[in-house]
Structure formats: structure tokens, C-alpha cells
Amino acid sequence: MTDPQRLPLVTAPTNRYDSSTVDAKLVNCFAEQGQGRDEYYVYKRPGFAYRSSVPAGTARGLYNWNNNLYSIIDGSIYKDGFLMSAALNNAGVYTFAPCLGATPKLFFKNTTNAYTIDGAGTVTAVTDINYPATTVPGSVYLDGTTYVFDAEANIYGSDAAGNDPTTWDPLNLIVAQIEPTAGVMLAKQLVYILAMKQFYTEAFYDAGNAVGSPLSPVQGSKMNYGCVDARTVKDVGGDLMWVAN
């Protein structure tokens, strides 16, 4: 008499073919071995469900804000698939930064134009003459102020007192100048603003300065890693990742 054969617990045998010599098939999941030799766990794979659609065109930005999906296609912005405005600048890639204030807004920009949209879907162009004419990708909201960055390594800030990304203070300016390389991307890590340049990265924090920019450089924080391309910068679960120079 032969010894009894131990069958796997995680799946039933012969559920793919009639032969018991062929392993079972896991659909939309995967198995991993646990701490013990005979421990196995089955995990469901992440899945996607249809939510909304937008017209065909060049995708320029996508962002989830307050459980609503905002997408920019060509020169139009959609909220959960519904058109909010067709008057955007139809160029480049848009980046986003949620803002607070009396009326919370979503600030979004490409390299030449900036806009806000509120929860009601009202889109407003930033027309303040103090907003820089050209910027690099990325925008950051920190302690009531919205910041943008340009290729000359200037960090511009909105009116800190008003908590309004449509109003920009001409004195709210600081330069990432430890090294003389061009600005590539502005990002945020925890409570710090990262000025990513071609070959170096510099960090700033909100020092609450009464005059000029509220920001001050974090002493000793210079990193000898720049950014190859702004589109490689991603925040993954609080960890900032990018392709470095």
C-alpha cells in the first residue's frame, strides 16, 4: 500500500485539466510562500474598473482631487469625464498642486500658463503679472503658499498671507544657488521643498520669514544627484523617486 499523497491546500487539483499531474491555475491572483515551509498565501491582484471617459486627443495631465478625476486632453479640462473648460493652453504636460484657503482649489500649470479649478468646476487663469512667464514642471503647496520653479533656479511663491494661488508676491522669491546649474523640477518631500536641478538637488523649508520668501535652505542638505527629466519624478507612498544625473 502506497503512502497517501499530500494535496496543495491553496487550490483544488485538476481544475485546469483532467489530469492530476498538471498544476492548478490561479486567475487574477498569485501565491507566495509564508514563513513556514508549508505555509502559502494567495493574494488578489490589483484590478481596475471603468470610471469615466474623455474624448480622444493628446493627454496632458491626470490628477485625483477630492475623489474626483481631473484630466486634461489637448486644451480642455474634464472632471470625471465632464468638460469644465476648453480654454487651456494646448501645450506640454501639466502638473498639479491642491491648495487650501477659504475656497480650496486645484492649481495646475504647464511651462507657460497656470490655472486653478475649485470644487464647483470654476476654472480661473492666473493672470498676475508677478507670475513668471516660463517655468519648469512641478508646483508645490506648503503652509498656505504655492511655489513654482524656473530654469534659472528661481523659486517663486504666491501671496503667503492670502492663501491664494492666483495672487503672486513679487518679493516671494528665493534662488537655489549652491551650484549654478539649471532648474529641472520642483517637488515636495514631507515638509521640505526640493529644487531639482541638472546635477544637484537642494532642499528648502518654511522658515516663516517675514520679508521675502518664507523659505530658507536646509543647511547641509545638498545632494549630488540631479534630475534627468521632470517626467521621471514620482511620489510612491511617501517615497520620492526619479531618474538622476
Task: Identify what each model region corresponds to.
Residues 72, 106, 242-243:
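Short beta-strand/helix segments in adaptor/scaffold domains that form protein-protein interfaces
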